[in-house]
Amino acid sequence: MAELATIARPYADALYKAQGSDLATTALWVDKLAAVAGNAQLLQFADSPKVSVDQVFDVVAGVASNANDPLPEAARNFLRLVIENGRLSALPEIASQFRSLKNAAGGMTDAVVFSAFPMDEQALNDIAAVLEKRFGRKLGIKVELDPSLIGGIRAVVGDEVLDTSVKARLEQMKMALIA
């Protein structure tokens, strides 16, 4: 994982500097490319010695764009560069590091909230307000379902974790009873 982060960093930095005037749009297409590049079957296809760089580019660009929303020229150029350099598998990490650079410039941090159950918009807004106050910064929140939590939430903000789930409380009780 650390190796992938090391590989991705120069690409994310270069993309951030090159697209400095249009970070929001760039974030959209780089996330779209990362989602496509995260597919294990696509990576296996791209690693095949029988497949050319142009074929890989055509497949990835074709999946990432459609008639209503074609990839911008900058996205196509970036994708071609990544594929030619054999770094397609690093694209999700490149997107993650690009988002971190973009958020840092805007005074924001990514946060992932794991919940046992789906949350409505009001509950998410309430949680966002509490987490922003707790961590002292603006958060871009993404929600993921994790039924193993039983109840409550687990919030991951950068390298900090706030776990108020039933599962965590049961683990704490178990440790207290064992000790």
From Swiss-Prot:
The cellular component terms of Gene Ontology attached to this UniProt record, alphabetical and capped at eight, are:
plasma membrane; proton-transporting ATP synthase complex
GO MF terms here are: proton-transporting ATP synthase activity, rotational mechanism
> Which Pfam family, giving just one, matches this sequence?
OSCP
Q: Does the keyword Zinc-finger apply?
A: no
What NCBIfam families has UniProt attached to this entry? ATP_synt_delta, PRK05758.2-2
Assembly and partners? F-type ATPases have 2 components, F(1) - the catalytic core - and F(0) - the membrane proton channel. F(1) has five subunits: alpha(3), beta(3), gamma(1), delta(1), epsilon(1). F(0) has three main subunits: a(1), b(2) and c(10-14). The alpha and beta chains form an alternating ring which encloses part of the gamma chain. F(1) is attached to F(0) by a central stalk formed by the gamma and epsilon chains, while a peripheral stalk is formed by the delta and b chains.
Q: What does this protein do?
A: F(1)F(0) ATP synthase produces ATP from ADP in the presence of a proton or sodium gradient. F-type ATPases consist of two structural domains, F(1) containing the extramembraneous catalytic core and F(0) containing the membrane proton channel, linked together by a central stalk and a peripheral stalk. During catalysis, ATP synthesis in the catalytic domain of F(1) is coupled via a rotary mechanism of the central stalk subunits to proton translocation. This protein is part of the stalk that links CF(0) to CF(1). It either transmits conformational changes from CF(0) to CF(1) or is implicated in proton conduction.
Q: What is this protein called?
A: ATP synthase subunit delta
Source taxonomy lineage? Bacteria, Pseudomonadati, Pseudomonadota, Betaproteobacteria, Burkholderiales
What gene name does this entry carry? atpH
